[in-house]
Amino acid sequence: MKDVALVFYGQPRAIDNDFLRNQWKNMLDITNLDVDVYGHFWSTTSNTNISKTYENFVKEQTVDVKNIKNSLLECLPFKKLVIEDSSIIDEICNRNFSHNRFIKRRVDLNNPSTGRATLGQWYSTQKGVQLANANGEYKIIVRVRWDLIFNAERWVKVIDNITRDFLEDEYGIKMQHIGTLDVSIVEGQPIVNDWLTIIPRSCFEFFSENLTDDISTMMNSIFSVPEMPLSVQENAFYRFLKMNHIDTKKVHMNCRIHRENDDPTKWRWPNFSI
């Protein structure tokens, strides 16, 4: 059994960014762990201004799948890499959200981009975990965004550092808990950070079997009450973990999301607006 499956998920943002490419290469080169790399990405990218109704949605762009795939394979030794057509999410959103007219505050079924940006990362996570389970045996799966920048001073053994507690503590491996960068309260609602997740074997099935539909259920529950969190995805993630009796353990690692025209050498924390 290998130590870690590193699973990239979601939209293929900044795939050709030199800083990010060097970061991931460096992490894999210096780790002492036995790591396989997997990826599940979408055929589109989009950027949004955070808002409760998504009225400020920025246009979606289709990527050159062949070039993106070649670029990724040139950068890292992916054991399996899938870039899937984003339209599959449109079908899932229609199936899971069409009965809930209140969810239009977030997902407008006439604007596919809104559904893809809301539910896409969870379907991508489910598929990525399935890829890892089908092609190897691992103690831990690290689910992570490609465009996540780690503090450059802490590149040394990043993968080792964020997984150590789960690998060294046999009790921890058997416990139902995941590692996350943060759990917090925003506008009175609890959220669990969804940029990076450390998933031990005890929790593999929760992320590989019904994750997309389960998160959809949590999102429908959010829109059944007047109070709504700013971060719908992260509040749905919190509800999903609580419903399945999965605890959280904080991962102590400074990181942030890469943005266009971003200078990664100028450190800012946090870089998101609430």
Regions inferred by a protein language model and the residue ranges of each:
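ER/Golgi luminal nucleotide-sugar-dependent glycosyltransferases, focusing on the catalytic module
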Residues: 1-274
